[in-house]
C-alpha cells in the first residue's frame, strides 16, 4: 500500500467508507525501516484491514458488485480505487534512434546530479526519470536540468536529501 493508497484509504475510511488496503509488497507508505513498518502496519491495521504480500484480482460479482480477491481473502465491493503509480510514457519518442541508452524499464540512463542523458545534449526531469515521482523532486530536477541545458558547461549539483512523508495518522517520515 503505497503513499497515495494509504493517504486516500485512511481518509476515505474516516469518512465512513469500508476500506481494505491491498499490496504485493509487505510494507506500507514507502516505509523502508522494518521496525517502523511493523508498527505502522499495526496502527493502520486497527482502522482497516491490510492484505499485504499478495497480488489482487477483480472479478464481477452479483448485483453489479465487484469481487476483490487477494490470497485467501475475498470481499464484495461497489468500487475499487487503484493507486499503483504511473509509468513514464517514453515509447513514442523513439529515443533509441537518437542513440539514447535505456535501462531495463525503458528509462534513459542519466546522471542524477546533472540530469544529463548520457553524453547527449538532452536533459531529463520530473516523473519521466522514473526515480521519485513527486512535485518537489521534479522541481529540483527541473532546476538542475534547466541550468545545465542553457549553460556552456555541465555542473554536477548536490541533490537535496529526498523526503519521504506519508500524510497519514500517524504521519510517517
Regions found by a protein language model. Name each.
Residues 1-2, 127:
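Glycine-rich Rossmann-fold phosphate-binding loop(s) that bind the pyrophosphate
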Residues 1, 15-18, 76-77, 119-120:
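Short coil/turn connectors at secondary-structure junctions
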Residues 75, 79-153:
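FAD-site-proximal beta/loop scaffold in flavoenzymes
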Residues 3-63, 133-139, 147, 151-173:
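Rossmann-like dinucleotide-binding cores of NAD(P)H-dependent redox enzymes
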Residues 61-74, 80:
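Conserved beta-strand-loop-beta-strand element in the redox core of flavoprotein oxidoreductases
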Amino acid at each position: 500500500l503505497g503513499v497515495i493508497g494509504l493517504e486516500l484509504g485512511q481518509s476515505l475510511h474516516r469518512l465512513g467508507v469500508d476500506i481494505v488496503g491491498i499490496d504485493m509488497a509487505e510494507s506500507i507508505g514507502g516505509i523502508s525501516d522494518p521496525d517502523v513498518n511493523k508498527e505502522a502496519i499495526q496502527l493502520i491495521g486497527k482502522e482497516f484491514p491490510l492484505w499485504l504480500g499478495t497480488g489482487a484480482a477483480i472479478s464481477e460479482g452479483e448485483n453489479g458488485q465487484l469481487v476483490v480477491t487477494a490470497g485467501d481473502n475475498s470481499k464484495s465491493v461497489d468500487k475499487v480505487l487503484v493507486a499503483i503509480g504511473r509509468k513514464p510514457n517514453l515509447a513514442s519518442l523513439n529515443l533509441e534512434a537518437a542513440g539514447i541508452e535505456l535501462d531495463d524499464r525503458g528509462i534513459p540512463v542519466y546522471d542524477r546530479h546533472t540530469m544529463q542523458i548520457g553524453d547527449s545534449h538532452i536533459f531529463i526531469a520530473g516523473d519521466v526519470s522514473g526515480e521519485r515521482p513527486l512535485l518537489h523532486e521534479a522541481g529540483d530536477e527541473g532546476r538542475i536540468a534547466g541550468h545545465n541545458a542553457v549553460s556552456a558547461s555541465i555542473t554536477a549539483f548536490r541533490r537535496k536529501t529526498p523526503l519521504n512523508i506519508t500524510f497519514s495518522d500517524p504521519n510517517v517520515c
